[in-house]
From Swiss-Prot:
Keywords: ATP-binding, Cell cycle, Cell division, Cell shape, Cell wall biogenesis/degradation, Cytoplasm, Ligase, Nucleotide-binding, Peptidoglycan synthesis
Organism: Campylobacter jejuni subsp. jejuni serotype O:2 (strain ATCC 700819 / NCTC 11168)
Location(s) in or outside the cell: Cytoplasm
Keyword DNA damage appears in the UniProt entry: no
MF term (GO), any: ATP binding
Superkingdom in the source lineage: Bacteria
Family in the record: Belongs to the MurCDEF family.
InterPro entries in the record: Mur-like_cat_sf, Mur_ligase_C_dom_sf, Mur_ligase_cen, MurD
Keyword Ribosomal protein part of the UniProt annotation: no
Protein name as it appears in the record: UDP-N-acetylmuramoylalanine--D-glutamate ligase
Chief site of localization: cytoplasm
Stretches that traverse the bilayer: none
CC per GO annotation: cytoplasm
């Protein structure tokens, strides 16, 4: 059986490295490969022009591999990594939505690791490296993965709220939503789906629990929010993690939940040498994440660093939302001019910075002790950085130099 891997990302590399003895050697196609070579394991590294669909039995794309790419168009046996590993997948919880996927996945794993749950998918470990004998897989599941998944399904699907994101990849917001909801049609009567009330009428055989907001979700599961130490925007993530625990174990471990330590790059606070507050929220790559960050600091004047790769999303609503804040903007990245145009239309003061270091220095000239400097860019980072994490690292380095 010949397996072709599309893209040389974390997912496909893990498959090629861990399963070469069982299924390999693999043919790996990537636009960066200009000539045919072999890696150290004997896998072929090929240019997409060399793909012959008649000589391939299965094609597995990296989750973010563009659906309009010529390899996807030619593939006859396309399946996601979830489909590929479905036959050996233990019971699973899939967590999706626009914001909060990672935190909810980590919190749920924190609550359930004592029963043998392991975490993977879009966060941490690719499926090829997860223990197939674990009691439970808790998978952060992206819209990209769901787009390419047509067979696999979870026992529990926890869907956080959906807002516009990755529209240049999906083509439209409706396509994005439909990919998020696509798994429901494969779930059965023994499965459970937790989803926003707006999608409550989506056809499925699974038991549906819909919610309007974090308060409503807490009521549905008998969760006392006063016992949770996390506040918005992380409160919904915490409630969802407890809801998953309640379904599986009929317990609510508040003390264990409150011992969870938040990861870096999400509303990560630090002080400069002048005791001024800076916040690294580099992972806020869409408007709803930025709105949540702004709401957290609504009682302070906010100096917001915004911009990067906007992924084709219209951010007009975000800038309208900003009108209710005492805020100044510092535009960076490939979308600098676009951010300045949004600001002008919304009558918001904005500085043209283009690069992150200049934005930090410009803010430092204006920032007072009772104000907040916030990197919450509403855009992806790949126009200037290798990842959102690198952007956050550079931000903190710049702040520490002040």
């Amino acid at each position: 059986m010949k397996i072709s891997l599309f893209g040389y990302g974390k997912t496909t590399r893990a498959i090629a490295e861990n399963l070469v003895d069982k299924f390999g050697p693999f043919d790996i196609y990537d636009d960066h490969f200009t000539e045919t070579k072999k890696d150290t394991l004997g896998n072929l590294l090929l240019n997409p022009n060399d793909f012959d669909d008649n000589l391939s039995d299965i094609e597995i794309p990296s989750p973010g591999f563009p659906p309009k790419h010529k390899l996807i168009q030619k593939a006859k046996n396309l399946q996601s990594e979830y489909d590929f590993f479905y036959d050996i997948m233990p019971k699973s919880v899939w967590i999706s939505g626009t914001n909060g996927k990672t935190t909810t996945t980590q919190m749920a794993t924190h609550l359930l690791s004592h029963i043998g749950a392991v975490m993977g998918g879009n966060v941490g470990t690719p499926l090829a490296e997860l223990n197939p004998y674990a009691k439970l897989w808790i998978l952060e599941t992206s819209s990209f993965t769901l787009h390419y998944t047509h067979k696999a399904k979870p026992e529990i699907y926890a869907l956080l709220p959906i807002s516009p994101d990755h529209l240049s990849w999906h083509g439209s917001f409706d396509n994005y939503v439909q990919d998020k909801l696509s798994v429901l049609k494969r779930m059965n009567e023994c499965d459970v789906v937790i989803l926003p009330k707006i999608y409550a009428n989506t056809p499925t055989k699974a038991h549906k629990i819909s919610y309007e907001d974090e308060k409503d979700l807490a009521v549905k599961f008998g969760i006392d929010t006063e016992k949770i130490s996390f506040k918005s925007p992380f409160l919904l993530d915490a409630i969802m993690a407890l809801a998953i625990e309640k379904i599986l174990l009929d317990t609510l471990s508040y003390k264990l939940l409150n011992s969870f330590v938040m990861e870096k790059n999400k509303l990560e606070e630090l002080k400069d040498s002048q005791n001024r507050l800076w916040v690294n929220d580099t992972k806020a790559t869409n408007e709803s994440a930025v709105m949540a960050a702004l709401s957290r600091y609504k009682d302070k004047k906010i100096h917001l660093i915004i911009g990067g790769d906007d992924k084709g999303v219209d951010l007009s609503n975000l800038f309208d939302f900003m009108k209710g804040f005492d805020i100044e903007l510092y535009a960076i990245g490939i979308s600098t001019e676009k951010m300045l145009d949004y600001a002008k239309k919304a009558n918001l003061k904005a500085y043209k910075c283009e690069v992150l270091s200049k934005a930090v220095n410009e803010i430092s000239n204006h920032l007072r002790v009772n104000e907040v400097a916030l990197l919450s860019p509403a855009c992806a980072s790949l126009d200037q950085f290798n990842s959102y994490a690198e952007r956050g690292k550079v931000f903190k380095e710049c702040v520490n130099k002040i």
